[in-house]
Structures are given as C-alpha cells and as structure tokens.
C-alpha cells in the first residue's frame, strides 16, 4: 500500500504526464472513445457542417489566436459547444471524429458515476476529471448532459440549493477549462440558459 506521501507524488506525476491515458475507473469516471469511421463518412446538413468546421478551426488555430495574437488577455481560454438532437443523430460520432481529425483524445464522461445524492460528492467527482484533463489536450464529452446541466430550480429546499451549487461549480470549471468541452442533449431546451449563453457554438 502506498504511503500518503508516495501517493501524493504519484498523483503529481500523473497530473503532469501529458501523455498519460487513464483507464475508466472509479477515480476517473470517463472513457476514451474512438471510431473506425472517418470525417467524410458523416452526413451533415450545411449548418451543422459549418459549425463543426468552426470547431475544427479553433482546435487547429486556437492556441495561435490566444497566445501569439495576445487575445488571452481579453478572452477566456477553451471552447464550449452544445450538440443537440434525438438519439442516433450522430452527436457522439461527431465528437469522436473531431478528436480523430485533430489527433486529440476524446473522453466521454460517465454521469452515472459523477452525480451523487451526497452533498459535495458530485463536485469532487467532477474535480477528478477536470484536474486530470486541464493540462492535457483532450476533448471532454458530456453525453445526456441534462443530468448535470439541466435547468436550475428555485431554492425552496436544501436539496434545491445543493443542486444549484453543483451547477455553479460546473459553470466555473467549464469556463476555466482551457480545452474543448462538448455537451450533448436530446432537447436543447433542457439545458439551463446560464449554460447556453456560454457556448461558442450550437449544432
């Protein structure tokens, strides 16, 4: 069994190792997703194709825009996109192919292991993902994101306040994340308006 000090050293090494590809486990509730298909295999309407090309441009040129052009002083790093549509319309495939086209790993967050009924646990579970991902060039894909990013409730009970605290925490972590975050939902109207205002693209 690792000592506490040894465990802390191991955690620091993992956090700093940019080539580290974690396996799906209780300590990292996300799974790397891949596909044998290619970008050209997707069938897209003009608007969606345009939105995805804009994302491609950001992935390939975002670092140059933010750092070389000095825009990091006035713009937050990172890119946030909402994919919506009925099941089977290609939301997961689009996210996976964005990663494949740009040689970036895509991790699908397992919300069943993230969301907890115990106060503070959902935030801790999210922190595990964001802490590991923030120094790596990953795409984080939240499928069926309504479970975490749905409309907030009025604060009539302690449970309501707890739920809204989770939303506030999520907003902060997503805004501070320097990489790509994709939220997927079956219905666009299910996503809280506070999140919707923070998306650079909606497809």
Question: Where are the model-predicted features located?
Answer:
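Conserved ASCE P-loop NTPase core motifs with emphasis on AAA+ ATPases
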Residues: 12-42, 46, 53-56, 146
């Amino acid at each position: 069994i690792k000592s506490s000090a040894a465990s802390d050293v191991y955690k620091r090494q993992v956090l700093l190792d940019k080539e580290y590809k974690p396996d799906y486990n209780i300590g990292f509730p996300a799974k790397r997703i891949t596909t044998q298909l290619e970008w050209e295999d997707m069938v897209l309407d003009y608007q969606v194709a345009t939105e995805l090309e804009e994302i491609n441009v950001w992935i390939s040129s975002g670092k140059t825009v933010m750092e070389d052009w000095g825009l990091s002083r006035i713009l937050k790093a990172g890119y946030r996109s909402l994919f919506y549509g009925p099941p089977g319309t290609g939301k997961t495939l689009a996210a996976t192919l964005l990663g494949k086209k740009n040689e970036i790993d895509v991790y699908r967050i397992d919300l069943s292991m993230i969301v907890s009924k115990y106060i503070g646990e959902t935030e801790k579970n999210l922190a595990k993902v964001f802490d590991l991902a923030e120094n790596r060039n990953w795409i984080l894909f939240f499928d069926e994101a309504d479970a975490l990013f749905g409309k907030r409730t009025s604060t009539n009970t302690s449970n309501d306040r707890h739920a809204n605290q989770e939303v506030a925490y999520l907003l902060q972590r997503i805004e501070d994340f320097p990489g790509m975050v994709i939220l997927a939902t079956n219905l666009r109207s299910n996503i809280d308006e506070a999140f919707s205002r923070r998306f650079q693209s909606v497809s």
